[in-house]
Amino acid sequence: MPEIAQAHTPMMRQYLETKARYPDAILFFRLGDFYEMFFEDALTASEALQITLTARSKGDDKVPMCGVPYHAARGYVARLLEKGFKVAICDQVEEPGKSQLVKREVTRVVTPGMVLDDQVLDPREASWLGAVALDDGRAGLALLDASTGQLQCGEVDGDERLVDELRRAGVRELVFSSAADGARAEAIARAVGAPAARRDAAEFERAEDRLRKHLGVPSLDGFGVSGLPLGLAAAAAALAYLADTQRAAPRHVDRISRLSTDDVLLLDEATRTNLELERTLSGGRKKGTLLALLDRTVTAPGGRRLAEWLRYPLTDLARIGARLDAVEELTGAAVAREELALALRPVADLERLLSRLVLGQGNARDLRALAGALLALPALAAVLEARGAARLREAGARLRGLEALAAHLDAAVAEEPPATLREGGIIRRGHSAELDEIVAIAEDGKGWIAALEAKERERTGIGSLKVRFNKVFGYYLEVTRPNLHLVPKDWERRQTTVGGERFVTPELKTLEEKVLTAEERRAALEERLFEALRQAVAAEAPRVRTAADAVATADALLSLSRVAAERGYVRPEVDASEALEIVDGRHPVVEAVLPDGPAAYVPNDVLVASRDAPECAEHGALLVITGPNMAGKSTVMREAALVVLLAQMGAFVPARRARIGLVDRIFTRVGASDDLARGRSTFMVEMTETAAILHNATRRSLVVLDEIGRGTSTFDGVSIAWAVAEHLHDVTGCRTLFATHYHELQDLARERPAVRNLTVAVREVGDRVVFLRKLVQGGASRSYGIEVAKLAGLPAEVLARAREILKNLEAMEVDEGGHPALARGRRRRAGPSAAQLGLFGGGAAADPAAEEVAKAIRAIDLDALRPLDALNLLAGWKKSLE
């Protein structure tokens, strides 16, 4: 950035001085009807926004510049935010012409985590800022949504857990102390995938005192956040960042809650991704996810609340039961659902309207929308209070108490106000007598002048009297010479002309002032009245926040009941046991997208219990699931995880019957993907996720594993899969669904009492294979991979060759090098050296090493040999023969 030199114009010096205070932001500098950018900002913005880069002359130099129209700035700001930039908005804070240089100030700084504009925000997604306070081995975190005023704080052990919580929330931006370890903070930000800001360490200090002062309470005990020094430090820093960037006191943040993992079902990033809760694995779309299926909400806050429940399922039986009671009542009452939907429809986004108004960024249209929403609350409250479920009645009660504010706003704000204050017409007629008079003058100034002229003619008897105007004298009364003797003594002479004289009266001067300054006074008075209304809203912020919370809750409950009623879901039994019993369960998303409709879905039972639970004797704790590709193993396992998640978020489930013993964590290891950016192969990703499961799963966890070990050699893969299964059975003892193509793992059931074998049934009809999609007791004997390849459309000659190779492999045919005779036909043509050999020789001379292997095989007691031991022996023999 160039030095602030006298060579620059006053305006450019003003720009440079402002830019120096915001070096990490792109400065939008208001010049008339445009926001202009200069120097490096212009170069950066023109490239990011694909707008024309021009230049401004400064002596012999050219200053790079670009600009965007003032009225279209929001869209450009949104695009810069998407690319991770901050934008400082520098506005004109006085009317041009009042001084040589218009006064300008930064009115707000828009960052990825500090967005209030409803045209930039996704109405159905929260916009979280994550503030982090680091200590040795422990971290405090705070989540703040500036657009709704929600503030939560908590503490976690270890950076891995911290990253997981930040990613679960979907934070848009991170804030760290300037005193924090830079490398550690950078690693956390990189893992979370969010831009980070470093703030003065003082913003993290004296946190409890500052929070008490902001919230106006003598103690934080009532919020349940005591004993969290790091969490409170992060919360104080988040509030400071909000106040600094928005240039306003965040009065809408009137409470703080504890961000606790003790009473929620934990879902790590891999699990959320694998279960496709909010984004599909293919393409990262919303359509095709569980959230898209469940979201039948009427309001945007309801949609955000539903997403929150999906991210944070419960482990508190009482809270789960209360939600289920409400969903059950609405599911069985179609008329009540329709009444509730109709009552919710006129309720705008109270949370975000309140935030914009309190922070000084709202306009008259926001006030009108707020008035309309508040006016609709009594009817909504009546619908909810008429219900039987406690959660519904409580929500209705929390909507009361805002009737006076609603009436005040409705009486004050015009029905269809303009977008900006300066356009005028934001206040209703009748709200302010002073404003009504000013507006009348502004709208009918000529009529007022004509009325005064007529009145003075009648009073004086001067028939030729005229009220005229010029720029020098303003309004005046003009009297011809023959009538000068009729001029009253209270008139004041201003000018003598050839034909007569010009006068003014006190009334005319008053009227002149009113008429000439009416527009300016109207704008100023409307601004004062608007500010008074804004302050009235801010004074009721706590009640509005409470009502907004109730609206969101009622809408989310309605959405769950709509889905349950339309799709035939049932109320799950959620208890303190360690059993999982799903009878005729269905995958909610898969059944919804079947071309032949949900009736075509084949339901399945999943019955499993932790190793030490009474139900384990019947169900088992570890289900080894085998079966061909495409038969539906992965779908059934995901279905079980989703049924648990739905039940613990308080929703009905797609099943004929479901009993869910509380689960503390769901782990899934499904699918395979490289992490090339971090130099990790598919197998490394698989092993890292598996290690996390083995280290963190408890007896109450649900573990879903699909094809563990397939990313390496067969022997290594089987060995790892076997050992992982043993650990989950012997050490963890949790409910585990373990799908595999390693049929050797079926032998675990002989050695481990809580292991059960299941397979997905198939039927062979001639040379065709029909997948029945049904889990049955027992193990699979074949994988039917070639049949799946046929379905995928592989050429016939490739399929024929594959069958030939498969027969060779199954017969253990090997060539003289000890390898399966995969290219037998070609090698025959090559000469006698490729003749088919027996498994242990059969050539001209016996191999001593092969003879030793054969001798060892003959000595084995097959009935006492474990599969894992057999694999180890095979590996040793192979090595001795190489």
UniProtKB/Swiss-Prot annotation:
Keyword DNA damage: yes
Residues in the signal sequence: none
SMART domains referenced in this protein's UniProt entry, alphabetically: MUTSac, MUTSd
Keywords: ATP-binding, DNA damage, DNA repair, DNA-binding, Nucleotide-binding
PROSITE patterns noted in UniProt: DNA_MISMATCH_REPAIR_2
Cellular component per GO, a single term: cytosol
CDD domains documented for this protein: ABC_MutS1
Xref: InterPro entries: DNA_mismatch_repair_MutS (IPR005748), DNA_mismatch_repair_MutS-lik_N (IPR007695), DNA_mismatch_repair_MutS/MSH (IPR017261), DNA_mismatch_repair_MutS_C (IPR000432), DNA_mismatch_repair_MutS_clamp (IPR007861), DNA_mismatch_repair_MutS_core (IPR007696), DNA_mismatch_repair_MutS_N (IPR016151), DNA_mismatch_repair_MutS_sf (IPR036187)
Pfam families assigned: MutS_I (PF01624), MutS_II (PF05188), MutS_III (PF05192), MutS_IV (PF05190), MutS_V (PF00488)
Taxonomy, superkingdom: Bacteria
BP terms from Gene Ontology: mismatch repair
Binding residue positions for ATP: G627, P628, N629, M630, A631, G632, K633, S634
GO molecular function, one term: ATP binding
Assigned protein family: Belongs to the DNA mismatch repair MutS family.
NCBIfam families attached to this UniProt entry: mutS1 (TIGR01070), PRK05399.1 (NF003810)
Function per UniProt: This protein is involved in the repair of mismatches in DNA. It is possible that it carries out the mismatch recognition step. This protein has a weak ATPase activity.
Alphabetized PANTHER family for the sequence: DNA MISMATCH REPAIR PROTEIN MSH1, MITOCHONDRIAL, DNA MISMATCH REPAIR PROTEIN MUTS FAMILY MEMBER
Name by which UniProt lists this protein: DNA mismatch repair protein MutS
Organism from which the protein derives: Anaeromyxobacter sp. (strain K)
Phylogenetic placement of the source organism: Bacteria, Pseudomonadati, Myxococcota, Myxococcia, Myxococcales
